[in-house]
Curated annotation (Swiss-Prot):
It comes from the Bacteria. This is Polyribonucleotide nucleotidyltransferase. GO terms for molecular function: 3'-5'-RNA exonuclease activity; magnesium ion binding; polyribonucleotide nucleotidyltransferase activity; RNA binding. Residues 549-607 form the KH domain. Keywords: Cytoplasm, Magnesium, Metal-binding, Nucleotidyltransferase, RNA-binding, Transferase. Residues 617-679 form the S1 motif domain. It is an enzyme of class 2 (transferase). GO terms for cellular component: cytosol. Its main location: cytoplasm. Its EC number is 2.7.7.8. PROSITE patterns: KH_TYPE_1 (PS50084), S1 (PS50126).
Length: 703
């Protein structure tokens, strides 16, 4: 069964069911142009016990053969998932999870495998649509379909699922997931676009993406898959009502405690007391836990919707108290601590030479070097957990990418600031919105490090409580508001526009009115936080840290690049050995790095001497490299040797190889050979020019 969807002016998308992988519960081959992604769904026979969340896992993988490459590195096969694969797995997972019905506890595994990738269409959005198509055609009672779309803007015009070339010229790159009538997920970056433009882009995508929804509905109508039953979790209605009578007032008392740790302890006490009063057995404990969490959510939502009262007593638009500590650490090249309520981020900046850039392999560009990196760490102690600290999890990689995307558009060009930049954010304490605290702390630390950022960047997380047509948008959400609410909408940017956005929801979609209010409220909050950042450090420091390496970039004429490098890298090695400076040639740019500015200047002077042209009439201090009876061979610039004939010397002292003398360039002949003389030499008017065979008995060559 194959269905087709037309998407704007791009190649059509084809969705083919059950062509491959027949042992899976369902499989979809989705393609656009030369890009093909195989998506499979596998479902366990029996539901899992003791969990209150959808046991869904999503894995996205790319094979190097998909774009005709062999994996780089010593081992020529794919290994653990790359950051790109992790990020795409998250983008697929996030819109699917809210549409898994509560009570369906069978384990569901969605696997997306890119089999072919052309140089036009990114497989990530195809994988989102393919995953939805695989689920609606499987035995999973998935409440879809949804579709994945990419929206860009080129020269003021929105483009759906743009090609790679179009994306390079775009001022925004937004991946979104949509249902039949609403937006369900947003992820993307922009170059300071206004909120109204972002909103227009999203609803343009919602309109154009309906062809993919209709194609999946056509697929389901044809296949008519049989769905597995949905179970019930939680206490019976009678027991749930008794729990509400016993625990409601005490839960509300606990909610009034501002401190997260104390509030959590109070809720645990209420939980234990209610469990004892109701006589809950060990076998009933899981159902009791589910109902207790449902009651917490219900009470919190009622307090906000009816009384506009939040857990910590704030109003819906209030931001928690903000404190900033600049340069708390001496040796890192830049550092800052940003604290908002009980969320605290320590950001540090490290500057490094170009040869320390991160090598990455991408579908469209092959091997490239990444200049700016932001790594986000979420240690267990940030939430008071007693567990070992392992390698970065998917969430940490995702939050780091979100913050990196927010800050990167404001960095100076590499030609103006020739450093590799690494920002590390360690979350020291967390109670909601640690990724947006990372954006703020990262901006402060970059200013502290002397990175010439164009502007400060700040971020804020927005929440939503919705019941029918009644809704409240919350600014600067707590962890509990994120957990028990309907939306986590993160927006980062400058005073002039949005640079990064991420939205996840737990309901089936958001209306345009909600999106407008959320973006406008987020803008007000962002302006407030930006004022705090500018108060702390109004502009980047003029100089980098004394502990940072020193750097300079030089423009090299294209025809001189080989001369600068030298045979087998001779000149680059000489600069390293002689001055302690490293040189990286990239196109027509030479990037010089050294521990001191003196070493950088010496290396730059040497490179200038290599590319400098010898001028007739110019006086140079040269090095004698050969002595003959008829004159001296003098190197006036590296690689440029001329003859100082005995007849052109005003004095004839004893000179040895290695001595330095001042010489003047009399002439450059048609073979680019240099004729030299003493600086004060005056050629007699009637003196004949020395014969060529006298001047040049031996061929000149570079030493």
């Amino acid at each position: 069964m194959i269905v087709k969807a037309e998407i704007g002016n791009q190649d059509p998308i084809y969705i083919e069911a059950n062509k491959y992988a027949h042992q899976a519960d369902s499989s979809i081959l989705i393609s656009q142009g030369g890009t093909k992604v195989l998506v499979t769904v596998c479902v366990s026979e029996e539901p899992l016990c003791g969990i209150d969340f959808a046991p869904l896992s999503v894995d996205y993988r790319e094979r190097s053969f998909a774009w005709g490459k062999i994996p780089g590195g010593f081992i020529k096969r794919e290994g653990k998932p790359t950051d790109r694969e992790v990020l795409i797995s998250r983008v697929i997972d996030r819109p699917l999870r809210p549409l898994m019905p509560k009570g369906f506890l069978n384990e569901v595994v969605v696997t997306c495998l890119t089999l072919s990738a052309d140089d036009k269409y990114d497989p990530d959005v195809l994988a989102i649509t393919g995953a939805s198509a695989a689920l609606v055609s499987s035995s999973v009672p998935f409440e879809g379909p949804i579709a994945g779309m990419r929206v860009c803007r080129v020269n003021g015009e929105f483009i759906i699922n743009p090609t790679y070339e179009q994306r390079k010229n775009s001022d925004m790159d937004i991946v979104m997931a949509l249902s039949k009538d609403a937006i369900v997920m947003v992820e993307g970056g922009a170059k300071e676009v206004e909120e109204s433009v972002l909103l227009d882009a999203l609803f343009f995508g919602l309109e154009k993406g309906q062809t993919l929804i209709k194609a999946q509905e056509e697929l389901v109508d044809s296949l008519k898959p049989e769905k597995k039953p949905i179970g019930h979790i939680g206490l019976s209605d009678d027991m749930a009502n008794k729990l509400k009578e016993i625990a409601s007032s005490k839960i509300l008392e606990a909610f009034s405690i501002e401190d997260k740790k104390e509030r959590s302890k109070a809720l645990k006490d209420v939980y234990a007391q209610a469990m004892q009063k109701l006589g809950i057995s060990k076998e009933q404990e899981f159902d009791f836990l589910v109902s207790f969490k449902d009651l917490e959510s219900q009470l919190m939502r009622e307090q906000i919707l009816k009384y506009k009262k939040r857990i910590d007593g704030r109003k819906e638009t209030d931001i928690r108290p903000i404190t900033i500590e600049m340069h708390p650490l001496e040796r890192p090249h830049g550092s800052a601590v940003f604290t908002r309520g009980q969320t605290q981020a320590l950001a540090t900046v490290t500057l490094a030479p170009k040869d320390e850039a991160q090598l990455v392999e991408t579908i469209f560009e092959g091997e490239t070097f990444k200049r700016f990196m932001l790594h986000y760490n979420f240690p267990p102690f940030s939430t008071g957990e007693a567990r070992p600290w392992g390698p970065p999890r998917r969430r940490e990689i995702g939050h780091g990418a979100l913050a990196e995307r927010a800050l990167e558009p404001l960095l100076a060009k590499e030609e103006d600031f020739p450093y590799i930049i690494r920002v590390v954010s360690d979350i020291l304490e967390s109670n909601g919105s640690s990724s947006m605290a990372t954006v703020c702390a990262g901006s402060l630390a970059l200013f502290d490090a002397g990175v010439p950022m164009k502007k400060h960047v700040a971020g804020i997380a927005m929440g939503l409580i919705k019941d029918g047509d009644n809704f409240v948008i919350l600014t600067d959400i707590l962890g509990d508001e994120d957990h028990l609410g309907d939306m986590d909408f993160k927006v980062a940017g400058t005073r002039d526009g949005v640079t990064s956005v991420q939205m996840d929801i737990k309901i089936k979609g958001l209306s345009k009115d909600i999106m407008i209010k959320a973006l406008n409220q987020a803008k007000e909050a962002r302006m407030f936080i930006l004022d705090k950042l500018y108060e702390a450090i109004p502009e980047p420091n003029k100089e980098v840290s004394k502990y940072a390496p020193k750097a300079q970039v030089m423009k090299i004429p294209e025809d001189k690049v080989g001369l600068v490098i030298g045979p087998a890298g001779k000149n680059i090695k000489y600069i390293k050995e002689q001055f302690g400076a490293s040189v990286w040639i990239d196109g027509a740019n030479a990037y010089i790095n050294a521990p001191t500015i003196e070493a950088v200047n010496k290396a730059a002077d040497f490179i200038n001497s290599l590319i400098q042209e010898v001028e007739v009439g110019g006086v140079y201090e040269g090095k004698v490299i050969r002595v003959e009876n008829y004159g001296l061979f003098v190197e006036v610039l590296p690689g440029k040797v001329g003859l100082l004939h005995a007849s052109a010397m005003t004095e004839k002292p004893t000179i040895n190889v290695g001595d330095t003398i001042k010489v003047k360039v009399m002439a450059i002949d048609e073979q680019n050979r240099l004729n030299l003389c003493s600086p004060d030499y005056q050629k007699p008017e009637n003196q004949e020019r020395p014969r060529k065979e006298q001047l040049n008995r031996k061929p000149h060559h570079r030493k």
